[in-house]
Amino acid sequence: MKNYGVKMLREQMENIPDIPFPEGFGIRNYRPGEGHIWTRIQRAAEPFIKMDDGLFEREFGHHLEVMPDRSFFVITDDGEEIGTITAWWNPDWKGVEWGLIHWVAIHPDYQGRGLSKPAMTVAMKRLKRSHDRCFLNTSTQRIVAIKVYLDFGFYPYLEAENSQEAWTAVASVLAHPILKACGF
């Protein structure tokens, strides 16, 4: 399958799934100076994007003061950081402010253990405190992630270039009621 960049929307913040972490795992807030931890996790987990040392600063450096409130690390009971998710925002997308689920990653050694949905619960609840709607960016080869996002009530954004082709490809390998409701 060709790897298209896609956007997904959630136009309201009600009925956020409340998924607890499995035994042995939890979540904590980012602490100042922990960009290197974020980078380590992203490098380990990211198959498509080159993670250079300056990425964290480019993505978050202009708003480091809000990171402890908006960025989270999935941790083991021993305190090892093995995942990350950020409840960010875009001040002017489509003419209004939107919350943004941003840079979700679970270290490959811990993928498949049911950690993404609990992390999404935490980030979505944080977004709900400040935003009436949210979106995220992902790509079509991240089928497991797309299923998580669909399960959290995100819909395909269909106004982007190649969106019909992209979501048709996703629907060819992932059956989901939201995709069906969107005509795929």
Stretches with model-predicted labels:
Residues 30, 104-106, 138:
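Hydrophobic adenine-recognition pocket in adenosine-nucleotide-binding enzymes
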Residues 1-23:
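Acyl-donor-binding surface of acyltransferase catalytic domains
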Residues 150-159:
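Conserved acetyl-CoA-binding loop of GNAT-fold acetyltransferases
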Residues 26-38:
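A short beta-loop-alpha structural element at the N-terminal edge
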Residues 43-106:
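A conserved beta-strand-loop-helix scaffold within acyl/acetyltransferase catalytic domains
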Residues 127-138:
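Conserved GNAT acetyl-CoA-binding A-motif
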Residues 136-146, 162-169:
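Conserved beta-strand-loop-alpha-helix junction that forms the acyl-donor binding cleft
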